[in-house]
C-alpha cells in the first residue's frame, strides 16, 4: 500500500510539470513521461499516451520499483523501467523527467556513436545539484534508441552506477532524461540542459 496523500502531492507535481514543459515546447503532443517518488517502494508516473500539457489527476498512476502497476488498470509508459532504475540506484532522487525537445533530439543525433556529450566551461553547469564550479565537466552519455526497454534500462543502470555524479542522459533521436531530489530540482535541470544544448548547437553552427 501507499499513502494516498503523498500520491496526491506527487501527482499534482507531475501535472504542474507537464504544463510547464509543454508550454516551453519541450514535451509536444503525447510525447514524454514524468514521475515522482511516493515512498521507498512506489512511484507516481504518467499514464501512457496522455497529452502532457493537459494532464489531470486521472492521468497519473502508481507503479512499484519494478514497473508494475499498483491498484490500477491503466498502462504506464513503455519506458517506465527507465524511471524505476534511477529510483533504485539513487534513494535520494524524488523525480525523473523525460522530455522530447527539438534541441535535445537534434543534438543527440549529432554526437558520434560511442561518444558522450561533454559540457565544460559553462557557468550554468552550477545549476545542477552538487556542481560548484564551471571548471568541472558534465558528461552526458548518448544511448542508442531501441524498443528493447529492459535492455536499455540495464545499460543505463550500468553506466550510472559507475558515474553517479552525472545528472542525465540522451537517447539518440529521442530525447532527454534527468532527475533530482525534488521536482523543482528536476525542472531546473531540464532548463539548464536546454540552455547548454542550445549553446552546443550554436557553437557547432558557428564552427562550420
Swiss-Prot record:
Top EC category: lyase
Cited PANTHER family: METHYLTHIORIBULOSE-1-PHOSPHATE DEHYDRATASE
Pathway participation: Amino-acid biosynthesis; L-methionine biosynthesis via salvage pathway; L-methionine from S-methyl-5-thio-alpha-D-ribose 1-phosphate: step 2/6
UniProt remark on cofactor binding: Binds 1 zinc ion per subunit.
Reaction equations catalysed: 5-(methylsulfanyl)-D-ribulose 1-phosphate = 5-methylsulfanyl-2,3-dioxopentyl phosphate + H2O
This protein's encoding gene: mtnB
Function text: Catalyzes the dehydration of methylthioribulose-1-phosphate (MTRu-1-P) into 2,3-diketo-5-methylthiopentyl-1-phosphate (DK-MTP-1-P).
Species whose genome carries this gene: Marinobacter nauticus (strain ATCC 700491 / DSM 11845 / VT8) (Marinobacter aquaeolei)
A Pfam family: Aldolase_II
Sequence similarity: Belongs to the aldolase class II family. MtnB subfamily.
Residues at which Zn(2+) binds: 98, 100
Co-factor requirement: Zn(2+)
GO biological process, one term: monosaccharide metabolic process
Keyword terms, alphabetized: Amino-acid biosynthesis, Lyase, Metal-binding, Methionine biosynthesis, Zinc
Enzyme Commission code(s) on record: 4.2.1.109
Protein's name according to its UniProt entry: Methylthioribulose-1-phosphate dehydratase
InterPro entries listed in its UniProt record: Aldolase_II/adducin_N (IPR001303), Aldolase_II/adducin_N_sf (IPR036409), MethylthioRu-1-P_deHdtase_MtnB (IPR017714)
Highest taxon listed in the record's lineage: Bacteria
GO cellular component, one term: cytoplasm
GO molecular function list: methylthioribulose 1-phosphate dehydratase activity; zinc ion binding
Amino acid at each position: 500500500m501507499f499513502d494516498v496523500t503523498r500520491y496526491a502531492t506527487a501527482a499534482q507535481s507531475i501535472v504542474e510539470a507537464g504544463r510547464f514543459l509543454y508550454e516551453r515546447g519541450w514535451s509536444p503532443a503525447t510525447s514524454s513521461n514524468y514521475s515522482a517518488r511516493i515512498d521507498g517502494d512506489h512511484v507516481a508516473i504518467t499514464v501512457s499516451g496522455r497529452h502532457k500539457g493537459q494532464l489531470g489527476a486521472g492521468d497519473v498512476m502508481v507503479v512499484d520499483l519494478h514497473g508494475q502497476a499498483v491498484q490500477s488498470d491503466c498502462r504506464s509508459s513503455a519506458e517506465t523501467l527507465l524511471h524505476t532504475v534511477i529510483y533504485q540506484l539513487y534513494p535520494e532522487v524524488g523525480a525523473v523527467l523525460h522530455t522530447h525537445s527539438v534541441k535535445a533530439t537534434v543534438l543527440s543525433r549529432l554526437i558520434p556513436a560511442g561518444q558522450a556529450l561533454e559540457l565544460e566551461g559553462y557557468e550554468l553547469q552550477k545549476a545542477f545539484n552538487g556542481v560548484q564550479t564551471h571548471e568541472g565537466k558534465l558528461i552526458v552519455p548518448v544511448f542508442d534508441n531501441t524498443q528493447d526497454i529492459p535492455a536499455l534500462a540495464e545499460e543505463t543502470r550500468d553506466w550510472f552506477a559507475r558515474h553517479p555524479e552525472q545528472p542525465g542522459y540522451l537517447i539518440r533521436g529521442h530525447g532527454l532524461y534527468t532527475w533530482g531530489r525534488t521536482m523543482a530540482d528536476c525542472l531546473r535541470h531540464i532548463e539548464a540542459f536546454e540552455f547548454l544544448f542550445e549553446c552546443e548547437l550554436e557553437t557547432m553552427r558557428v564552427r562550420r
